[in-house]
Amino acid sequence: MGLLDGEAWEKENPPVQATGCIACLEKDDRYPHTCNKGANDMTEREQEMIIKLIDNNEGRPDDLNGCGILCSNVPCHLCPANNDQKITLGEIRAMDPRKPHLNKPEVTPTDDQPSAETIEGVTKPSHYMLFDDIEAIEVIARSMTVEQFKGYCFGNILKYRLRAGKKSELAYLEKDLAKADFYKELFEKHKDKCYA
């Protein structure tokens, strides 16, 4: 696969749709879980064990897992850390049944339809309009070969995907992912304006 082969990269790194819990989307417990992950499916006894684990580990870091999690008064067969050595304290905290339930949509592998609503500032940011309805992207395209413009667009796609959600607000995640998708459209729209 070449550096600028967007289709192959897309297959290996499918875009994440911007809905659901940022911590779950990013698989990163440094973000707060907003999903109340798993709390709806637990028995009352399992909920009690989660509460004990959370209380036993108050003030300890979220990235602890396995035997690093203090589990006194929690039977081994009911301890999630015993059943899944990779589960972190942050993930256990996300299952806290004492947290209010947030009914946010979960991401599914088939959730690949573009949003019906446009996100303001993505497709026509006013600061990129130069004069007489000429956009900066047109000037950029006209100053490059098709391969250079392809690299410029794919570089921006990569930039927006890498930074998506890093500002830890869902609105920024959605906007960054929308910008990444928009650069694909920009390449198709303006590649004919490039010089040979």
Curated annotation (Swiss-Prot):
One of its GO terms (molecular function) is deoxynucleoside-phosphate kinase activity, ATP as phosphate donor. The keyword Kinase applies. It comes from Escherichia phage T7 (Bacteriophage T7). Nucleotide kinase that catalyzes the phosphorylation of dGMP and dTMP to dGDP and dTDP. A double mutation in this protein and the RecBCD inhibitor gp5.9 protein allow phage to overcome the retron Ec48 bacteriophage defense system. This protein alone when overexpressed in E.coli does not cause growth arrest; Y128C may be a silent mutation. GO terms for biological process: symbiont-mediated suppression of host innate immune response. Dodecamer. This is Nucleotide kinase gp1.7. Disulfide bonds: none annotated. The keyword Amino-acid biosynthesis does not apply. Changing Y128C: Allows phage to overcome the retron Ec48 defense system.9 protein. Its EC number is 2.7.4.-. It catalyses: dGMP + ATP = dGDP + ADP; dTMP + ATP = dTDP + ADP. Residues 97-118 are annotated as: Disordered. Keywords: Host-virus interaction, Inhibition of host innate immune response by virus, Kinase, Late protein, Transferase, Viral immunoevasion.
